[in-house]
């Protein structure tokens, strides 16, 4: 199964770009960090807040994914069409894969740049996807890198020049998609709300909003 075929079958008309929650009728939008500001009064990073974010994203991931689930790890990379001919997938995936042989299985498809900016036609989105299992990934590092988008601490995603990469965890065993947009929050959507209802009930205090059509 490929990513495009799966999305067309189970999440029809969904685009794997930020704000998947707003595109789909069943999902949860979580607020991360317990409303603690990212910086201290002296402008240093508030590491306590980041520790809370890392813990929350890890808890949510482990509630949604089991080690043997089949998943697509999807990464959107954004680039200038002429200034950058290609993006090296090694920079995108290598630090987060336990087995480097998986690098040969990564698929890529190019799309128009999805955001509204001046001269958007000069840019494009390359969407990488890898069919794997959570046990194949350095999940903790992936979750931290997604949360660290706006701040310098590591781990970070590499290989980008204009916009920070967006990473989606697509669970094809359970028909769930998980997306961390930055340290402020994350989104979970599902083909059937019953798959994510236990998560909603257990961590209701973190929920910003939800939909259960």
Curated annotation (Swiss-Prot):
Pfam families named in the record: DUF3885
Domain of life: Bacteria
Natural source organism: Bacillus subtilis (strain 168)
Name used for this protein in its record: Uncharacterized protein YnaE
Classification via InterPro entries: DUF3885
């Amino acid at each position: 199964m490929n990513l495009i075929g799966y999305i067309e079958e189970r999440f029809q008309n969904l685009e794997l770009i930020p704000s998947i929650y707003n595109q789909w009728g069943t999902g949860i939008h979580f607020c991360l960090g317990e409303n603690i500001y990212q910086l201290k009064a002296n402008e240093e990073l508030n590491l306590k807040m980041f520790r809370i974010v890392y813990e929350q994203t890890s808890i949510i991931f482990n509630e949604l994914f089991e080690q043997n689930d089949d998943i697509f790890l999807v990464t959107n990379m954004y680039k200038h069409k002429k200034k950058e001919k290609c993006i090296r997938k090694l920079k995108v995936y290598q630090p987060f894969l336990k087995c480097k042989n998986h690098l040969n299985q990564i698929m890529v498809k190019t799309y128009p740049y999805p955001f509204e900016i001046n001269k958007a036609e000069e840019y494009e989105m390359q969407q990488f996807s890898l069919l794997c299992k959570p046990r194949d990934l350095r999940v903790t590092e992936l979750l931290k890198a997604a949360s660290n988008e706006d701040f310098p601490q590591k781990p970070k995603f590499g290989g980008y020049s204009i916009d920070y990469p967006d990473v989606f965890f697509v669970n094809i065993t359970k028909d769930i998609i998980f997306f961390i947009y930055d340290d402020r929050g994350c989104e979970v959507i599902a083909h059937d709300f019953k798959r994510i209802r236990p998560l909603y009930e257990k961590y209701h205090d973190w929920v910003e909003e939800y939909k259960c059509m």
